[in-house]
Amino acid sequence: MKTLDDLETQLGGFAGRRVLVRSDLNVPLDHDRRDGAGQPVITDDGRLRASVPTLRRLLDAGARVVVTAHLGRPKGAPEAKYSLAPVHARLAELLPGVEVGFCPVTVGAQATAAVDALADGELLLLENIRFNAGETSKDDEEREAFADELAALADAFVSDGFGAVHRKHASVYDVALRLPHAAGGLVATEVEVLQRLTAHPERPYAVVLGGSKVSDKLGVIDNLLGSLLGEGDRLLVGGGMVFTFLKAQGYEVGKSLLETDQLDRVAGYVRTAREKGVELVLPTDVVAATAFAADAEHDVVAVDAIPADRLGLDIGPDSGAAFAARLADARTVFWNGPMGVFEMEPYSHGTRAVAQALVDGGAFSVVGGGDSAAAVRTLGFADERFGHISTGGGASLEYLEGKHLPGLDVLS
């Protein structure tokens, strides 16, 4: 992949050049809370902060930076709740001394005029790219036509939205075919980290998987047990997905989340792990509640004694300690998915135990985006206490599955 330095050389410098940057600014918003300007409150600005170094590098070199990004999943038309206006306000705060403008459209005469008005070292954020049907269209002609409009706004393209590189979208894939291009610093770092996880990881290698559904992790488990993990490595499973693992081994799980259609496949994972010498670590106790609510009656119970009228919402304290012990001497750790419903304090302790184990251990630890990143920040852990916090949940998983990611392939 070309770097920013390569692109700067190719262009003869960034000064005066219009550079279209595809960033990942897809941050969580709390629409029930408002800031001083009346905008929804951003609850985790990690992706914004991760985007700043690439933007600052271009701005300091005199580029006229045009940023495009998505927020949420609008259906190809404007929806007020998905506007990037709150993101614009926070981005301006993160770039002091920079003129940061906002354009309420993405392409067309208004966008062209706004880009033309930029001076060297200024930035323009375009409105949500997914307000345009062409961005995500499965029709190649429609998507490519939209990419033509985007490319007309710039002299070069920088791909820095790692969280979207697994999508064959106009602003991720097609624009790169139309302009001189390079990977931004964030994308380059993410790829370097993932290569470290897949090429020659230090061992013992421990992978911690959580989240609600095992069906969301099938591809990555297939690849982990098929090639990445070997004898002496560990696969630790928690979160809602663990109840399918427990049921596959004969345990009753009450009203806990269960994917009955995956039981046979999960039973196969258990056998494969045993045959390969991969230690499969499952909880021995869980926090079982009468309802999915923070104030519901709840108790710690053994996994062989989950009441029929209760659902598991976190791994228990004994399991948290056991997980921490299996992570203590690991040399490489990848973690994707919380151990419980961390947003509710009674069910946050398992996730906290895993996070603390990574902080205390000596492994190169990677927190795999999405809910995992939100969890560690919500629980008060600083980013720098981990080896790397990825900005790409789905993209990271697909990379670990061994899939080709369109947004990376086009940069190669």
Swiss-Prot record:
Top class in the EC scheme: transferase
EC number: 2.7.2.3
One annotated Gene Ontology cellular component of this protein: cytosol
PROSITE patterns referenced in this protein's UniProt entry, alphabetically: PGLYCERATE_KINASE
GO biological processes: gluconeogenesis; glycolytic process
Binding site residues for ATP: K217, G312, E343, G369, G370, D371, S372
This protein's record includes keyword Magnesium: no
Main location: cytoplasm
Protein transport among keywords: no
Alphabetized InterPro entries for the sequence: Phosphoglycerate_kinase, Phosphoglycerate_kinase_CS, Phosphoglycerate_kinase_N, Phosphoglycerate_kinase_sf
Catalyzed reaction equations: (2R)-3-phosphoglycerate + ATP = (2R)-3-phospho-glyceroyl phosphate + ADP
Pathway: Carbohydrate degradation; glycolysis; pyruvate from D-glyceraldehyde 3-phosphate: step 2/5
Family named by the database record: Belongs to the phosphoglycerate kinase family.
Name of this protein: Phosphoglycerate kinase
Species, as recorded: Kineococcus radiotolerans (strain ATCC BAA-149 / DSM 14245 / SRS30216)
Gene name as annotated: pgk
